[in-house]
Amino acid sequence: MSGFFITATDTEVGKTVVAGALAGVFRELGYNIGVYKALQSGHVASNPEGDAARLKVLSGVPTKEDEICPYSIEEPLAPRLAMKRAGRAVTLKDIIHHYNERLKEFNSLFVEGAGGLAVPYTEDALVIDFAKELQLPLIVVARPTLGTVNHTVLTIAYAKAHGLTVAGVILSGCKECEMERVQENKVMIEELSGVPVLGLLPFFEGEFTKEEVLESAKEYIMISKLEEFIRNESTVAHTSSN
């Protein structure tokens, strides 16, 4: 298996934009990559404002929205609570099954979590339990502003304590007028966590196009560093199968 698990320090930080943009860029580079978000609350999968629809558009995958996200609910709550209130029972086994179904279509998947790693996810697991099952390297998406050093370092420490590999951090929503502080936060995160900040993705104001997002990802994210992970994972997987 190869790909990335995209998590964040909080909700509404930019995971979907990052996950979709990275998948879109890698697909342009010729990689057979899909996207997967097991559970979504706040919108049903078919809603164009929801994460599943945005992942589909940004990545350019042919997968249907309800296959990208097999479990979705309208109420904007933590997934476990939203599903419980809707009378739906979703287990870790269920979402792993759908993950494996997507792997029949793609060589690699970029998997988006929900909120942060400690979010109650299925009825029997947190987001981090799902990440541990997949054993994909993490990309941590974080805010660029005040408070992000603490949130990001804690997220990385939590991931490492559970045996997960953190490929890097992407600060999302960076504004030109704040770049001096953003750069200071970048340096501090790297010093305190030992994990590289691989990108400073700009703030997208108002409506934006797929092309604008992908071009920004190419310009502001170290795609080559992430490509090394994909290649190394593919090599390990190939060696293990022989």
Swiss-Prot record:
Binding-site residues, Mg(2+): T16, D51, E112
Name its cellular compartments.
Cytoplasm
Tell me which UniProt keywords the record has, alphabetically: ATP-binding, Biotin biosynthesis, Cytoplasm, Ligase, Magnesium, Metal-binding, Nucleotide-binding
Query: Which molecular-function annotation in GO is an example for this chain?
Result: dethiobiotin synthase activity
Q: Where along the chain is substrate bound?
A: S41
Cofactor(s) needed for function: Mg(2+)
Superkingdom per UniProt? Bacteria
Assembly and binders: Homodimer.
Family as reported in the entry's similarity comment: Belongs to the dethiobiotin synthetase family.
Query: What's the protein here called?
Result: ATP-dependent dethiobiotin synthetase BioD
Q: Which organism is it from?
A: Bacillus cereus (strain AH820)
- This chain is encoded by the gene named bioD
